[in-house]
Amino acid sequence: MADITAAMVKELRERTAAGMMDCKKALTEANGDIELAIENMRKSGQAKAAKKAGRIAAEGIIIARSAGNVAVMLELNCETDFVAKDASFRALGEKVAEIALADKIADLEVLKNTDFGNGESVQVTLNNLIAKIGENMNLRRIVIAEGDNLATYIHGSRIGVITKLVGGDADLAKDLAMHVAANSPQFVKPEDVSAEVVAKEREIQVDIAINSGKPKEIAEKMVEGRMKKFTGDISLTGQPFVKDPSVIVADLLKQKGADVQDFIRFEVGEGIEKQETDFAAEVQAQIAAMKG
């Protein structure tokens, strides 16, 4: 039996909005597996708002650049929001993006070992900034996209999107990049949703219907309609267009004679846990480090 810690209970509460004792019980029954606990709580109706992506805690910036038919997007992490807003930190990230774009470097290790333009590698230059500011930093991920109709969109330096279209125009590609940033679709089209994702959601929805008092055969019929809505909700082309919710993205694309080949969405700190720190102490620590 896994040890159920206060931190695990706290995370489950934040991700489900359920009570402390319910979370502790769910974790115990799931042997400490948070994702399984969320799934079980959804089935029983306890989870009010299970957040699919989990908590986003790490700090940093997303940078995107494009030229012609090539676009690049990267994530540069740091420990605090204080440093994420630092001009030298941002300048380094922008220069790295320009280097990657110029040479179409999609391999992170190759990029880290590429000359920064100062006689030292990207990683050594980053290490020098770490020593200067006194906070750990990491060039976490990078992606290169190529196509005839590409667009990039950055929202508040924390969310970045590249869209790749066939047909349409630059404005449409940019609008859809903005849509992806705002609505976080997981797939391009409903038919792209994996069988595993569909099966898991179907099981959850059937259990919810049965627990509400419906016979199993009726519950299964009810779920068919819910599943169509589910696959549409998590797919770009099935969502209402962010700039005009009366239009579904699939219909917008048809009107414009365009198709979405792919999209890539980065959000700062996805999947990274960050130790909680007192903000005032965090600021004082950064000021002291800079003075030192």
From Swiss-Prot:
InterPro entries: EF-Ts_dimer_sf (IPR036402), Transl_elong_EFTs/EF1B (IPR001816), Transl_elong_EFTs/EF1B_dimer (IPR014039), Transl_elong_Ts_CS (IPR018101), UBA-like_sf (IPR009060). Transmembrane segments: none annotated. Keywords: Cytoplasm, Elongation factor, Protein biosynthesis. CDD domains: UBA_EF-Ts (cd14275). It is found in: Cytoplasm. Associates with the EF-Tu.GDP complex and induces the exchange of GDP to GTP. It remains bound to the aminoacyl-tRNA.EF-Tu.GTP complex up to the GTP hydrolysis stage on the ribosome. This is Elongation factor Ts. It comes from Tolumonas auensis (strain DSM 9187 / NBRC 110442 / TA 4).
